[in-house]
Amino acid sequence: IENLQNFYRKYYQPDNAVLLVAGKFEAASTLALIQQVFGAIPKPNRVLEPTYTQDPAQDGMREVNVKRTGDVQLTAVLYHTAAGSHVDSAAMAALSEVLGGTPNGRLHKNMVEKKLAVNVSPWNFDLAERGYVMFMAELNKTQNLAEARKVLLEELEGLQKKPVTEEELKRAKASLLSDIDKTINDPQKLAVQLSESIANGDWRLFFLQRDRIENLKLADLQSVAANYFKESNRTLGQFIPTATPDRSKLPDAVDVAKLVADYKGKAAASEGEVFDI
């Protein structure tokens, strides 16, 4: 509980928080109320240190398989990407739509419609620092996990052989820009999205991303795909349902002080150096 309290005191402070008010309200009285409620909280003495390091580029494909009881199979592919404020994030958002959109995305057409998977979904994480993009396929127990994995990788890492088309780009941009327009017209959604942009550095990033999406070209998507969707930058995970998981039994750490308390050892060697003659 002490660790939890220390974490709370360090980060849950007004100087590390964002407050957004959305909808129809009276600005002066609202600001006065905010000042009344939060202004009384003293400024903390602690200093929030900036991140002092970052993950280096991945130097080889990684894979993890989890075998537990369950009803569905999963295979997922994750790639490291740039920070959400980077220009590449707009092209990555469009690529995620081209590949993972429903019902026109390549993965939906080549996996779901062909009964290789029940569902395929993209997860694009734009963070203040380097982020990642993930594509996950869900299978029932009768579908072939190895075949689904094969097709998933071919679609993701085969964009140089099967480039994005002008029609796909146009459709992706229309979908993304439509979502942005809907967000702008919904005060609650807009507040949430602006808070995400603030966490990434500035509220204006939300509108900058819109402008970047509007100006996307095919070459932008192909360049981003070539840089990020490669084996050396890939982490692949699979969930394999197993009725009886085979787990090693790992003993707890022992009390070493108690273990050696009565230890006598063997007869001591003679003092001094021992030389072979």
Predicted regions mapped to residue ranges:
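Non-catalytic, conformational "gating/processing" segments within enzyme and secreted inhibitor domains
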Residues: N3-V37, N233
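Short beta-strand/turn micro-motifs at beta-sheet edges
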Residues: Q5-R9, R62-V66, N119-F125
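Acidic/histidine-enriched segments that form metal/cofactor-coordinating
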Residues: I1-F7, Q54-P56, G60-R62, R171-Q188
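Active/ligand-binding-proximal structured segments within catalytic/core domains
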Residues: V77, V87-L99, R106-K109
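M16 family metallopeptidases and their MPP-like homologs
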Residues: N16-A22, D71-A83, K109-N215, T235-I240
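Solvent-exposed, non-transmembrane alpha-helical starts
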Residues: A32, S85-S89, N144-A148, D186, ...
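Proteolytic maturation boundary segments
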Residues: E26-K67, L78, K109, L208-I277
